[in-house]
Amino acid sequence: MKNFNLLVVSSILLVDLFPTNCGHNVHFSRAINLNGVSFNNVDASSLGAAQVRQSASRGRGLGENPKDEEGADKPKKKEEKKVEPKKPRENKLKQPPAGDGAPEGDGAPAAPAGDGAPAAPAGDGAPAAPAGDGAPAAPAGDGAPAAPAGDGAPAAPAGDGAPAAPAGDGAPAAPAGDGAPAAPAGDGAPAGNRAGGQPAAGGNQAGGNRAGGQPAAGGNQAGGNRAGGQPAAGGNQAGGQPAAGGNQAGAQAGGNQAGAQAGGANAGNKKAGEAGGNAGAGQGQNNEAANVPNAKLVKEYLDKIRSTLGVEWSPCSVTCGKGVRMRRKVSAANKKPEELDVNDLETEVCTMDKCAGIFNVVSNSLRLVILLVLALFN
């Protein structure tokens, strides 16, 4: 019985000591890798999904109210509030009492103002009252001439269709009404605005604002603002000729700038595309280089299986790890084995199971030691 037990143990140990190409250790290493993969790659997505479903069902069960669901389709009646009628707004503005300098009604002349106080505006059709010294004259009504202003005060603007009153010494002339000539300005004062582009009186005066872009009369005058957005001409130009089209130049510059920006964007996109293409090409080259087997390894394996190599794929050159396999090309199917070279073969990299490595060596050494101990002491 003792000898039988020794024989069984020895046979088991001898079977375990077989080389790896016999298949025993390969299957053992596969089992180890399989166990490691199963232990490490635990997929917790199913557990997470179960927890989400459980939480959703629990929340639905706690938050549901069947009465609310039944009554959800029924419209809720809102309590209508009674709208109180709004009180009409009253004009709470205080009307100024009639007194000295108060405005008069239509057709009545305005009262003369005191010294230092502005004259009241006259009604339509009535002449404005003369203003006191140092006070601006009141504007005249439509169709009536404006009153003359006092010394040092600007003249009032005339009504439509009436000539403007002359301004006092040192004060600017008032603007004339539509269709009427502007009043002469005081000494050293700019001329008023003129309708229809009337020329200003006197030399060395700044041209007023003119409609239609008419030039100002007289030399050494700066061109005023003209309708149509035309730029003013420089000094010492007769007739206020418009300058070269600055807007056109600006538009061209803007167009060039926009085109440059668009070109820059296209160039940037092109560079990005080229970079992406180069990256893709580099990855493809790396993959091809990884799939190309070593020429030395191919030649050595060809010398081993030269006599048995055909048009079918040969076994992998290794039992574990990365190796190479090969076959004849169709054009070299009838060649003799001695005439075959690397150009007549199709090769590719083959990957087998990972080798057991140090674990396999240690286990085989322990089994050998146990077998020797049993054999020597029995």
From Swiss-Prot:
Q: What is its main location?
A: membrane
Q: Give positions of region: Disordered.
A: 50-288
Signal peptide from the UniProt entry: 1-22
Gene Ontology cellular component list: cell surface; cytoplasm; plasma membrane; side of membrane
From the Swiss-Prot or TrEMBL record, state where the protein is found: Cell membrane; Cytoplasm
Region listing for Region I, in residue ranges? 92-96
Annotated region Required for the binding to heparan sulfate proteoglycans (HSPGs) on the surface of host hepatocytes: where? Answer: 81-89
Which cysteines are disulphide-bonded? 316-350, 320-355
Stretches of Basic and acidic residues bias are at 65-93
What the entry says about post-translational processing? During host cell invasion, proteolytically cleaved at the cell membrane in the region I by a papain-like cysteine protease of parasite origin. Cleavage is triggered by the sporozoite contact with highly sulfated heparan sulfate proteoglycans (HSPGs) present on the host hepatocyte cell surface. Cleavage exposes the TSP type-1 (TSR) domain and is required for productive invasion of host hepatocytes but not for adhesion to the host cell membrane. Cleavage is dispensable for sporozoite development in the oocyst, motility and for traversal of host and vector cells. O-glycosylated; maybe by POFUT2.
Keyword Ribonucleoprotein in annotation: no
| Residue span(s) of the pro-peptide | 356-378
Identify the residues that the record assigns to the TSP type-1 domain, covering every copy.
304-356
Task: Show the coiled coil region(s).
Answer: none
Q: Which residues are glycosylated?
A: 319
InterPro entries xref list: Crcmsprzoite, TSP1_rpt, TSP1_rpt_sf
Q: Where is this region: 11 X 9 AA tandem repeats of P-[AE]-G-D-G-A-P-A-[AG]?
A: 97-191
What ranges cover the sequence repeats?
97-102, 103-111, 112-120, 121-129, 130-138, 139-147, 148-156, 157-165, 166-174, 175-183, 184-191, 193-208, 209-224, 225-240, 241-251, 252-260, 261-268
Going by the UniProt record, its keywords in alphabetical order are:
Cell membrane, Cytoplasm, Disulfide bond, Glycoprotein, GPI-anchor, Lipoprotein, Malaria, Membrane, Repeat, Signal, Sporozoite
Topology relative to the membrane: Lipid-anchor; GPI-anchor
Q: Where is the lipid attached (GPI-anchor amidated cysteine)?
A: 355
Q: What is known of its domains?
A: The N-terminus is involved in the initial binding to heparan sulfate proteoglycans (HSPGs) on the surface of host hepatocytes. The N-terminus masks the TSP type-1 (TSR) domain which maintains the sporozoites in a migratory state, enabling them to complete their journey to the salivary gland in the mosquito vector and then to the host liver. The unmasking of the TSP type-1 (TSR) domain when the sporozoite interacts with the host hepatocyte also protects sporozoites from host antibodies. The TSP type-1 (TSR) domain is required for sporozoite development and invasion. CSP has two conformational states, an adhesive conformation in which the TSP type-1 (TSR) domain is exposed and a nonadhesive conformation in which the TSR is masked by the N-terminus. TSR-exposed conformation occurs during sporozoite development in the oocyst in the mosquito vector and during host hepatocyte invasion. TSR-masked conformation occurs during sporozoite migration through the hemolymph to salivary glands in the mosquito vector and in the host dermis.
Q: Which family does it belong to?
A: Belongs to the plasmodium circumsporozoite protein family.
Q: What is this protein called?
A: Circumsporozoite protein
Which organism encodes this protein?
Answer: Plasmodium cynomolgi (strain Berok)
* Gene, per the UniProt record: CSP
